[in-house]
Amino acid sequence: MQRLVEIERFDSEESVEVTLRPSAWNEYIGQEQIKKNLGVFIEASKKRAEALDHVLFYGPPGLGKTTLALIIANEMNANIKVTAAPMIEKSGDLAAILTNLEEGDVLFIDEIHRLSPAVEEILYSSMEDFRIDIIIGSGPAAQTLKIDLPRFTLIGATTRAGMLSNPLRDRFGMNFRMQFYSPEELSKIISQASNKLNKKIADEACSEIAKRSRGTPRIALRLLRRVRDFADVANEKDILHSRAQYALDELGINSYGFDEMDIKLLNLLVGANGRAMGLSTIAAALSEDEGTVEDVLEPYLIANGYLERTAKGRKATPSTYKILNVTMPALDDGGLF
């Protein structure tokens, strides 16, 4: 079952996201420092009539990495080729993409940390020297064919920057860490999207949805669409605060943006009586794999101070005890089980 607060994109959401996605800097809300720096680099590249240096965006899913890549291409007046690492299975697949690029084009590779080592090696020379070496034949008769490439910009996006090899990471001239969004930024995003959906929404309703959206635009837009469903069924022309509040409560998203799975995890940690819990123990108790716990459940809770990762495991924070209305243990022996 898919969670409404899931940060990964649902298969059915791609076309909707395209409709609601901003296409220019003045429409893009949030990530102000990244926008400011990119604006300088883009302007400098345009003045020199050069391709923009390679860019790496990293951070949790749903924060706008793909959108920024599309805006960069738009600002550079460049064509963009969008792909994902799992679709590039062999070095020949990447070579075919690279040899079809034109001068100044942008190549966006999502989930770039999932490239195989063989494919990654092709990127090294193409990023640094704008050249690829293709081996024709095998054995003693094998020959290397050098193919020059037009100067292009590679934009990589990853949720696991630590999984990138050092040689690949070092070839990106710009590295940007995407931050979670403030409730105020999300409110603006929700209002903007509501206009595109031709549905008026009260400011208070925007704020209500925003505070339950876990700092993530993808979740905010998903919740907006579900709240709109409730309003439409109730034959309400506008989305009012009371309707947004009712809809989100019915959907099981509380005022902290927690759903049932979050509450289960936090109750599990609180039940440890101040001791740290190992990742494998948590995963087994929740019937989830460790990767899901680490990459999907934990980031928002850690970023907002509800969960602490220590050398000995995971622990609930004072904020967690407070919102769950549980008294903190007087002693903490720091044990692990």
Swiss-Prot record:
Residues engaged in binding DNA: 309, 314
Disulfide bonds: none
Residues that bind Mg(2+): 66
Subcellular location: Cytoplasm
Region (Small ATPAse domain (RuvB-S)) location: 182-252
Region (Head domain (RuvB-H)): 255-337
Domain remark from Swiss-Prot or TrEMBL: Has 3 domains, the large (RuvB-L) and small ATPase (RuvB-S) domains and the C-terminal head (RuvB-H) domain. The head domain binds DNA, while the ATPase domains jointly bind ATP, ADP or are empty depending on the state of the subunit in the translocation cycle. During a single DNA translocation step the structure of each domain remains the same, but their relative positions change.
Family per similarity comment: Belongs to the RuvB family.
Function: The RuvA-RuvB-RuvC complex processes Holliday junction (HJ) DNA during genetic recombination and DNA repair, while the RuvA-RuvB complex plays an important role in the rescue of blocked DNA replication forks via replication fork reversal (RFR). RuvA specifically binds to HJ cruciform DNA, conferring on it an open structure. The RuvB hexamer acts as an ATP-dependent pump, pulling dsDNA into and through the RuvAB complex. RuvB forms 2 homohexamers on either side of HJ DNA bound by 1 or 2 RuvA tetramers; 4 subunits per hexamer contact DNA at a time.
NCBIfam families xrefs: PRK00080.1 (NF000868), ruvB (TIGR00635)
Name of the protein described by the UniProt record: Holliday junction branch migration complex subunit RuvB
Taxonomic path: Bacteria, Pseudomonadati, Campylobacterota, Epsilonproteobacteria, Campylobacterales
Encoding gene, per UniProt annotation: ruvB
